[in-house]
Amino acid sequence: MGPSPQTPQSTQSTHPIDDAGAGAPPERPLRIVAVLFPHVTQLDFTGPAQVFSRMPHTELHVAWHRIEPVPTDGGFSILPTTTFDDAPQADVLFIPGGRGAFELLEDATVLAFLRRQAATAEHLASVCTGSFLLAAAGLLEGRRATSHWGSLHLLERLGVTPTAERVVRDGPAITAAGISAGIDFALRLAAELHGEDAAKRIQLQLEYDPDPPFDAGAPSRSDADDELAHAQIAAMTELRGEVVDRAAARLHAG
């Protein structure tokens, strides 16, 4: 056997955008704690992480049960930087989505971690189906939130008001719709934390200027074959509904 890998360190911004006139930096970096899990949709995580990497005085901690490679839906793995036991308290709690998120709705350790982090976090953030984890932990009850359009309606079963918008802010919660909306959410958060000018500079550095070949990225505008698109996710949505129902029963029983 070869030597054991070193424990990775949290990721700090390596090329941050400075805030003009922001004054003295805080005593410690802003802490963003992200939850990683098997079969995470990689762009849900990596898109916002790219924005976070350019925010000034910011640390990104990536948590999972163990420090070991975690497979994504993209065919590659990501190595967490910390465990649920060792993660620091977050200023921003961030949950990406993916099919693996629904498996975590029944993971008591993960839900307890989210509640513990939420007790002190100023921002509760999610992308895509990551909002279901926040909801299952009781952190979105009575609030507006969004998710991927294919699962959005299921949020209501967890006491959430489903809202079909790209980014939804309600109190401490800021949720993004499906997958690519994560970049929009992260830029909005950057603007809230560091000012609009700083967020615009990050957007320019990333050359985030979407110009898709088709206007088919939202159900309200798409001229794609809606029946086929819905049929392809119908079976998955039915299974997800069963998991959400069990999570709702536990939430309401508590």
Regions found by a protein language model. Name each.
Residues 131, 174-190:
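Active-site-proximal catalytic alpha-helix in oxidoreductases
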Residues 1-124, 132-135, 152-154, 162-164, ...:
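Extended, subdomain-level signal for the structured scaffold at the beginning of enzyme domains
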Residues 105-108, 146, 177:
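Residues at secondary-structure transition points
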Residues 119, 169-174:
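Short pre-catalytic strand/loop immediately N-terminal to key active-site residues, enriched for Gly-Thr
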Residues 146, 150, 181-184, 197:
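Generic recognition of short, well-ordered alpha-helical interface segments
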Residues 124-125, 146, 163, 174:
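Structural detector of well-ordered beta-strand residues that form the stable sheet scaffold
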Residues 140-169:
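A conserved active-site-flanking secondary-structure segment within enzyme catalytic domains
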